[in-house]
Amino acid sequence: MLTISKLIPQGQGLAPVLLRRASTMELDWDVRQKSRFEATDSAGRQLGVFLPRGTVVRGGDVLVAEDGSLVKVDAAPQPVLRITPCSSHGTAFDLTRAAYHLGNRHVPIELKPDHLKIEPDHVLADMLRAMHLTVLAVNEPFEPENGAYATGGHAHDHDGEPEHVHGPGCQHAH
């Protein structure tokens, strides 16, 4: 079994040719939120992944094996509930309200401009339908938010402005 103990977020800094040559593996959210797991890559190799505790693997991340080989992670399609405003009388605010109620329940949630995604839960689905939202069971990749206290952001200030923090993936320049 090949051991992996390093993660490069979104393959940052790697040449595109290296990413094209890397093996891949599809992992669902249940596995990607664990820091230790076993998996098989597209080359058929058995992998033992041992990342620092609390590490979450995202689709697009690249894992580095002990032999130097790279493995690109894809978020596997999995059963999720896709939540959208009612097409006849819903508004974008309905999604904001739904996100608030789901957040109060500490539900892992993927936020998109036009929809939300959560793991299947018939009680939550009924609650959302009662809020006049459309809830559809689909099979799609799931990338929930890290949460307000997750690590990985960066802090900086702007000439005379108070310091503030941007989350992972923020690409704007100042």
Curated annotation (Swiss-Prot):
Membership in a protein family: Belongs to the UreE family.
Gene Ontology CC entries for this record: cytoplasm
Stated role: Involved in urease metallocenter assembly. Binds nickel. Probably functions as a nickel donor during metallocenter assembly.
Top-level taxon in the UniProt lineage: Bacteria
Keywords on record: Chaperone, Cytoplasm, Nickel, Nickel insertion
Subcellular location: Cytoplasm
Biological process according to GO: protein folding; protein-containing complex assembly; urea metabolic process
UniProt biased composition (Basic and acidic residues): 154-166
Region (Disordered): 146-174
Pfam families xrefs: UreE_C, UreE_N
Organism from which the protein derives: Albidiferax ferrireducens (strain ATCC BAA-621 / DSM 15236 / T118) (Rhodoferax ferrireducens)
Entry keyword annotation includes Cytoplasm: yes
Protein name per the record: Urease accessory protein UreE
An annotated Gene Ontology molecular function: nickel cation binding
Alphabetical list of HAMAP family matching this protein: UreE
